[in-house]
Curated annotation (Swiss-Prot):
Membrane topology, as annotated: Peripheral membrane protein
The family this protein is said to belong to: Belongs to the ABC transporter superfamily. Thiamine importer (TC 3.A.1.19.1) family.
Source organism (scientific name): Salmonella typhi
Upper lineage: Bacteria, Pseudomonadati, Pseudomonadota, Gammaproteobacteria, Enterobacterales
Protein name listed in UniProt: Thiamine import ATP-binding protein ThiQ
Subunit (UniProt): The complex is composed of two ATP-binding proteins (ThiQ), two transmembrane proteins (ThiP) and a solute-binding protein (ThiB).
Length: 235
């Protein structure tokens, strides 16, 4: 579904280089130390950064040079980027038409995703009138209403309290499973990764240093566990 072949980004003339394959419907966590290149990897996939070399394939098509607006990808950031002067209904509608002129089918899609996110009663409110969790639900709805096959999450729930964060992770995981979306999620928490992603990759020094089962990483038995400060539970 998603394949990166030696995708290279030059950071202060030092190369970050990624080779990765992710299957359709797979949920993968991206972990690693601060500054390792996790967000860079997502931005290369989304098209916000242009690689110096390499190839990026999505569903077998070459999207290495495709602009972000035309890539079959949606991305959600920690900063939800909602427009403060637009209400919830309009912010979601932007995912369907930047001009907010929606036909009947598009309006039904907008309303359906609002119901699924549990925000249908908030449609007339402005972002400033919402809680942090509600704003992230709106931002997630705007991503999902675009119906792209790849969803990228760059720590969008890290500012939420633990209970709400777990609720949002479960919601995302369920929706991705239901729609067979391919999910890549950057996180600093291996515990969060274990809730949503059976597979993890660890990025270090601009490379994929390890990839495998999240449970193995969490147990401390993986070679990359030490990079994340995880100690083996075996005495």
């Amino acid at each position: 579904m998603l394949k990166l072949i030696d995708i290279t980004w030059l950071y202060h003339h030092l190369p970050m280089r990624f080779t990765l394959a992710v299957e359709r419907g797979e949920q993968v966590a991206i972990l690693g130390p601060s500054g390792a290149g996790k967000s860079t990897l997502l931005n290369l996939i989304a098209g916000f950064l242009a690689p110096a070399s390499g190839t990026l394939l999505i569903a077998g098509e070459d999207h290495t040079l495709t602009p972000p607006s035309r890539r079959p990808v949606s991305m959600l950031f920690q900063e939800n980027n909602l427009f403060s002067h637009l209400n919830v209904q309009q912010n979601i509608g932007l995912g369907l038409n930047p001009g907010l002129t929606l036909n009947a089918s598009q309006r039904e899609k907008r309303d359906a995703i609002a119901r699924q996110m549990g925000i249908e009663s908030l449609m007339a409110r402005l972002p400033g009138e919402l809680s942090g969790g509600q704003r992230q639900r709106v931002a997630l709805a705007r991503c999902l209403v675009r119906e792209q096959p790849v969803l990228l999450l760059d720590e969008p729930f890290s500012a939420l309290d633990p209970a709400l964060r777990q609720e949002m992770l479960t919601l995302v995981s369920d929706i991705c499973r239901e729609r067979q979306l391919t999910l890549l999620m950057v996180s600093h928490s291996v515990e969060d990764a274990a809730r949503i992603a059976p597979r993890s990759i660890v990025v270090a020094d601009g490379r994929i240093a390890w990839q495998g089962k999240t449970d193995e990483l969490l147990s401390g038995q993986a070679s990359a566990s030490a990079l994340l400060g995880i100690k083996s539970h075996i005495l």
